[in-house]
């Protein structure tokens, strides 16, 4: 999860987020090299005493600054497209959970079970227990098995919302009348926090998301109790 004065991205707990972190570093290095080159050229132009005012064209330079940006864009586009296809790939999910956005809470339904559904509201600040996080804790966490592919079906009952969990690399819009889907897989147990990431009204900041990733045996025990 995030911590105060954090400069980087949250720690990855899913294969997709690990790929996104690598892509971020890859793109950042390209931007750094371009910025350094531009700064170096500007410094040379400001400090040199050499001038050539009669130059009308320079085809070699024009060729270089046409081909080089094209190569750079390809180096950025190829890994980006690879990750986009990975995020859209859904193969034999072990569990399906339907998520509905409301003003201003989330509701969840485990579609593989006959009657396993609940609403998830933010816990008010005055009701928090010691150690709990302000504006991030909920009364009903989404308990899911780790190291298994989970499909999330996401929609909305009223206005636009967005279901986002940064540590898992997830952000999917919840649109009224439309059912979007995404997959998640956590590689380690723990609590993972997210929030609605689409401005949806006056209490937009007060509809957090909490995923509790647990071993399969614990999940089976929890689901049996809930049903």
Swiss-Prot record:
Disulfide bonds: none annotated. It is a multi-pass membrane protein. The keyword Protein biosynthesis does not apply. The modification Phosphotyrosine is found at residue 218. Its cofactor is Cu cation. It is found in: Mitochondrion inner membrane. The chain crosses the membrane at residues 15-45, 60-87. It is an enzyme of class 7 (translocase). The keyword Iron-sulfur does not apply. One of its GO terms (biological process) is ATP synthesis coupled electron transport. GO terms for cellular component: mitochondrial inner membrane; respiratory chain complex IV. Mg(2+) binds at residue 198. Its main location: mitochondrion. Keywords: Copper, Electron transport, Magnesium, Membrane, Metal-binding, Mitochondrion, Mitochondrion inner membrane, Phosphoprotein, Respiratory chain, Translocase, Transmembrane, Transmembrane helix, Transport. GO terms for molecular function: copper ion binding; cytochrome-c oxidase activity. Binds a dinuclear copper A center per subunit. CDD domains: CcO_II_C. InterPro entries: CcO_II, CcO_II-like_C, CcO_II_C, Copper_CuA, Cupredoxin, Cyt_c_oxidase_su2, Cyt_c_oxidase_su2_TM_dom, Cyt_c_oxidase_su2_TM_sf. Coiled coil: none annotated. Residues 1-14, 88-227 are mitochondrial intermembrane. Cu cation A1 binds at residues 161, 196, 200, 207. Component of the cytochrome c oxidase (complex IV, CIV), a multisubunit enzyme composed of 14 subunits. The complex is composed of a catalytic core of 3 subunits MT-CO1, MT-CO2 and MT-CO3, encoded in the mitochondrial DNA, and 11 supernumerary subunits COX4I, COX5A, COX5B, COX6A, COX6B, COX6C, COX7A, COX7B, COX7C, COX8 and NDUFA4, which are encoded in the nuclear genome. Component of the cytochrome c oxidase, the last enzyme in the mitochondrial electron transport chain which drives oxidative phosphorylation. The respiratory chain contains 3 multisubunit complexes succinate dehydrogenase (complex II, CII), ubiquinol-cytochrome c oxidoreductase (cytochrome b-c1 complex, complex III, CIII) and cytochrome c oxidase (complex IV, CIV), that cooperate to transfer electrons derived from NADH and succinate to molecular oxygen, creating an electrochemical gradient over the inner membrane that drives transmembrane transport and the ATP synthase. Belongs to the cytochrome c oxidase subunit 2 family. This is Cytochrome c oxidase subunit 2. The lineage of its organism: Eukaryota, Metazoa, Chordata, Craniata, Vertebrata.
